[in-house]
């Protein structure tokens, strides 16, 4: 401290002296010293991390034998493609898909459904992954980590289509049936969902698309014929690859990257698997390496935990977004709001007559979509529970168009948002994590300006939940048909619908994808 004080006599030069010894610098140096002191100097090659090896073993050894998983995968496949077609209606989405160099057509390349693009499989994975995620309307998995396992279809479909076209052209490849794609989806769902059940990546600031990258890499490695060891190498490459931060999903930085982050992740997965196929190796202790491994650098030094071995559990229990293009934690809140809109109509009232609104929800919703203040864009609005409740209360609907600037300019929306209070219901939070329930409950109670309190409406699980699968399947297929008709002429729609029944599993994947070519 004496040196610190005496330096004050040297005028401007002392400012430089003091800055170089700020507490932050000292803390940083101590951190570096501690980190350097723990560096491993033993260069003996360790065994492959068990987590990585288990995923590789699952890819190479597990046989899908669940009829429930296969039928759910068929529905998921159709729904995911339909969501992609709907996403293409939005110019911001259409602007970023296609080849990197306009006009490029890759012989025997991946065809992008809903377009006339034919691109390389890496770009194809980005294109397909982006369009299916754009509207936040594809499937969902909720646990310690959240996500949308059908995002992996970007890489799976891109590789299957390219490999099949290449094989039929007499080049290196393999003919894939739709059944193979569905089995790949089941495994990708299981890997992403299995890692998500007990491990919260969001709590360390990482986005859930890290799991898309891991799952897509594993499945695509198997599709490309990589050995068990190469598959483990590719998975390690996915773990070491720079991981996306969640900041683009949260205030004050919410923006459209959240809509193409999964496309980016699944395309990187394809690229990494192809690099390993060409001879690149891996890192056996990518997770557990001291100082430099994933656990120490990105996961707070904690190791992953697992609830169950890999099978077909996730696909069997996956959640479909059927009624609303809304962040899944708000799905049942939207359903409650729709029912309350009808109650208001019966009373001869409108949203203008509302004095206050209380929303009981889960802890996850409180953290992700409880949002105050101005909403700046589409991405902001579809991640705000107050906005997603206000629209049904005002209009009796919630569609993708309701997140646009035109609709959002209605002053009634923000006025209604100001009247809402969100509180966590511990039961909802507990049932959210319970493996035998996986509920996503919300409840809404409205008080009118005249003092009338409407009966609270509680919905524990949405129509896309496994508990309501029988009720939801016809509505899901209607959603698929509606999305087809929004993109193609009726004759083409009928051909796709005719091919999409349960016999679809026997079709070559390129022939099915050809049905989705958009001709101007």
UniProtKB/Swiss-Prot annotation:
EC number(s) recorded for this UniProt protein: 4.2.1.79
Tagged with keyword Transport: no
A biological process term (GO) from this entry: propionate metabolic process, methylcitrate cycle
Pfam families assigned: MmgE_PrpD_C, MmgE_PrpD_N
Chief localization: mitochondrion
Annotated InterPro entries: 2Me_IsoCit_deHydtase_PrpD, MmgE/PrpD_sf, MmgE/PrpD_sf_1, MmgE/PrpD_sf_2, MmgE_PrpD, MmgE_PrpD_C, MmgE_PrpD_N
Induction and repression of expression: Slightly repressed by glucose.
Gene Ontology MF term list: 2 iron, 2 sulfur cluster binding; 2-methylcitrate dehydratase activity
Temperature-related properties: Optimum temperature is 25-40 degrees Celsius.
Oligomer and partners: Monomer.
Function summary: Component of the methylcitrate cycle that catalyzes the dehydration of 2-methylcitrate to 2-methyl-cis-aconitate. The methylcitrate cycle is a metabolic pathway for the consumption of propionic acid.
Protein name: 2-methylcitrate dehydratase, mitochondrial
